[in-house]
Amino acid sequence: MKRERSNILNLRMDELKEALAAINEPQWRAAQLHQWLFSHRAGSFDDMTTLSLPLRRKLAESFYIQQPVTEKHDETMEGSPAGATEKLLIQLPDGERVETVLIPGPNRMTACVSAQAGCLLGCSFCATGQMGFRRNLSSGEITGQVWALSDMLQERNREASISNIVFMGMGEPLLNTANVIEAVLNLSTRKYRFSTSQRKITISTVGITPEIDRLADTGLKTKLAVSLHSAIQEKREALMPQAARQYPLDRLRESLIGYASKTGEPVTLAYMLLKGINDSEMDAKRLIRYASGFFCKINLIDYNPIVNIKFEPVCDGTRERFRDILQDAGLQVTIRKSYGTPINAACGQLAADCTGNSDNL
């Protein structure tokens, strides 16, 4: 019985080698094939002129090439002095949807990509968690989001190109570690289309400690950001019940110390300030205790409004007082500006238009 063809873009490098072996081709050809797919972005096997015609025919018998499709585009100039923040709703070949965001900044252009369709963690302040979990994205589907944003730039004849990549879109990257790592390699390999420095790639996580440990041992030089939001275990459990209970703060801190030590990169602790929840002087002092003694920096983030979620952002004075307490203790602190709020493209707002109307999310 003839096997049904599948999308070759969903295969990692190790899987490409296995696929070639299955059709009696040498595994070393996987590097050529991989470059055609993820650097040259070949649209068909006929485009792969450095591969023999018999090999191209065999590949076409077992596989097809299908890129994700951009279904919707939104943009806003609000809050961004460097240009429009833009969001793409992307439909994957099986009909699932994800969102990806282009964020302009001084001397940089950042692609914010999703690692999963939906999310199973259900953090209380996040729109993606309201969707539930659909599935992990393949490394090709993650890479394809950067391609889609890059295509958008080129179509408008912008001189700017994507310089930074952050895994801060939909889903938990470290519950899809193998495909995230493969996507990082796709996007950072020298002489490939993007060749992005790994030090300009940030992987964000709620704190999946075994995967943080695994990431630290890969030799990758990516940066790590952790959604902390409270240094008090009980409060963190209320905000992020699944992640906080399964990966307690003490165990998380051990992993963060190990990551910073092995990579030489500071860990970013993301802290979303929520009015009356985690914004007190006591909260700041507990954060000081938690963050002291290892290589880290703190990003304070404003809460972005989400329908059916009742948190409130803090006022400017509260945010600045909280920052000052941390800085007076010697911590490196940045107040992170949120871009894309009017189009539901800011931190915590991505939900893949799951109601059919992104304006309602």
UniProtKB/Swiss-Prot annotation:
Any GO CC annotation of this UniProt entry: cytoplasm
Entry-linked HAMAP family: RNA_methyltr_RlmN
Principal EC category: transferase
Family, per entry: Belongs to the radical SAM superfamily. RlmN family.
Ranges in a coiled coil: none
Residues of the Radical SAM core domain: 105-342
EC number assigned by the record: 2.1.1.192
Sequence positions that bind S-adenosyl-L-methionine: G171, E172, S204, S227, L228, H229, N304
Keywords assigned by UniProt, alphabetized: 4Fe-4S, Cytoplasm, Disulfide bond, Iron, Iron-sulfur, Metal-binding, Methyltransferase, rRNA processing, S-adenosyl-L-methionine, Transferase, tRNA processing
CDD domains assigned: Radical_SAM
Required cofactor(s): [4Fe-4S] cluster
Gene Ontology BP annotations: rRNA base methylation; tRNA methylation
Subcellular location: Cytoplasm
Entry's cofactor comment: Binds 1 [4Fe-4S] cluster. The cluster is coordinated with 3 cysteines and an exchangeable S-adenosyl-L-methionine.
NCBIfam families for this protein: rRNA_mod_RlmN
Gene Ontology terms for molecular function: 4 iron, 4 sulfur cluster binding; metal ion binding; rRNA (adenine(2503)-C2-)-methyltransferase activity; rRNA binding; tRNA (adenine(37)-C2)-methyltransferase activity; tRNA binding
rRNA processing in keyword set: yes
The species this protein was found in: Chlorobium luteolum (strain DSM 273 / BCRC 81028 / 2530)
Protein name: Probable dual-specificity RNA methyltransferase RlmN
PANTHER family: 23S RRNA METHYLTRANSFERASE, RADICAL SAM CORE DOMAIN-CONTAINING PROTEIN
Active site annotation, chain numbering: E99 (proton acceptor), C347 (s-methylcysteine intermediate)
Catalytic activity: adenosine(2503) in 23S rRNA + 2 reduced [2Fe-2S]-[ferredoxin] + 2 S-adenosyl-L-methionine = 2-methyladenosine(2503) in 23S rRNA + 5'-deoxyadenosine + L-methionine + 2 oxidized [2Fe-2S]-[ferredoxin] + S-adenosyl-L-homocysteine; adenosine(37) in tRNA + 2 reduced [2Fe-2S]-[ferredoxin] + 2 S-adenosyl-L-methionine = 2-methyladenosine(37) in tRNA + 5'-deoxyadenosine + L-methionine + 2 oxidized [2Fe-2S]-[ferredoxin] + S-adenosyl-L-homocysteine
